[in-house]
């Protein structure tokens, strides 16, 4: 299995104990790639007492590098989607671009990624 980028929506299911077969497989195989914004989103939504364990868990995963060229591509993706009448937030464009940068599968439940996938080479699946 190639790299698998995982959106916050799938992590929410994972941490709530809901079925996430593709994520479970990617974790077992060590192919999960974590967009930096997803770290912030996860940590902003948990109890302070859970933070150290969550940081340790997330810290063991591969963090997607986001060099300057990545952010240029994020802006270009947002612009291209806007030209098609599709509003995409910067965080969502960043997550999608993390997957596009590595030709990785993106796991998400967020419908915006389906619209991005129809307009780009983004490979998308549910968790």
Can you say where each PLM-predicted feature lies in the sequence?
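Alpha-helix capping/helix-boundary segments
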Residues: 10-11, 38, 70, 94-95, ...
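Phosphate- and divalent-cation-binding pockets in alpha/beta enzyme and binding domains
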Residues: 41-42, 73, 115-116
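General small-molecule cofactor/ligand-binding pocket signal
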Residues: 33, 64, 123-125
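Structured helix-beta-strand junction loops
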Residues: 28-30, 60-61, 84, 102, ...
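Active-site neighborhoods of divalent-metal-dependent phosphate/nucleic-acid chemistry enzymes
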Residues: 21, 63-107
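Histidine- and aromatic-rich ligand-binding microenvironments
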Residues: 6-7, 34-35, 87-89, 110, ...
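Acidic, PIN/NYN-like endoribonuclease modules and their adjacent C-terminal/linker elements
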Residues: 1-3, 16, 96, 100-127
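Short, well-structured N-terminal submotif of metal-dependent ribonuclease cores
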Residues: 1-34, 43-57
């Amino acid at each position: 299995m190639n790299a698998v980028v995982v959106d916050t929506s799938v992590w929410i299911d994972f941490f709530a104990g809901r079925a996430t077969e593709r994520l479970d497989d990617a974790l077992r195989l060590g192919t999960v790639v974590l967009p930096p914004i997803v770290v912030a989103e996860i940590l902003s939504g948990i109890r302070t007492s859970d933070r150290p364990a969550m940081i340790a868990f997330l810290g063991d995963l591969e963090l997607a590098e986001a060099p300057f060229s990545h952010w240029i591509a994020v802006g270009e993706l947002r612009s291209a989607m806007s030209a098609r009448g599709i509003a995409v937030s910067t965080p969502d464009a960043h997550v999608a671009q993390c997957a596009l940068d590595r030709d990785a599968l993106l796991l998400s439940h967020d419908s915006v990624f389906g619209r991005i996938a129809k307009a780009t080479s983004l490979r998308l699946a549910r968790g």
